[in-house]
Amino acid sequence: MKHKTFSLLEKIEKKKIEKETIKIKNIYLHKKKHIKQLKLLSGYQQEYLRKIHDKLILGVSVHQWQNYNSFISVLEVIIQDNINTIKKDEKIIQESFKIWSKNQIQGNIWKHLNMIHKRKILRIKKIKDAIINDSHIQLKFFKKV
């Protein structure tokens, strides 16, 4: 029964490790997507800042300036949201790595205990086989005598 328990616990830890690995991969891809989006949005922001600067030098109506300014403000909010999402993803990745590492250690412990228990069972089986074999030989000897 204990043999099955150690084996079962080892399998559970392996499943936890697989689950955490998939989670890390998905969060990493999510973070990568937001980094790419952040670069794109920052590029747009720089482009519009250059345009408004050039138009301010050449002269721009108040209405156009307000439109550019509103758009740049919206971009800043979206950029900040992306930065916050990237930071949140990074924290989740770090926490997931800690959990993954803990599960790895726990899995190795259960694996080690499982191997020790298997060796112990094998040793007990060999002893029982030797006892049965010795009893069988003694029984044959007594029958001859």
Swiss-Prot record:
It is found in: Cell membrane. This is Flagellar FliJ protein. One of its GO terms (cellular component) is plasma membrane. It comes from the Bacteria. Belongs to the FliJ family. Flagellar protein that affects chemotactic events. Keywords: Bacterial flagellum biogenesis, Bacterial flagellum protein export, Cell membrane, Chemotaxis, Membrane, Protein transport, Transport. Its main location: membrane. It is a peripheral membrane protein. One of its GO terms (biological process) is bacterial-type flagellum-dependent cell motility. InterPro entries: Flag_assembly_chemotaxis_eff, Flagell_FliJ. Pfam families: FliJ.
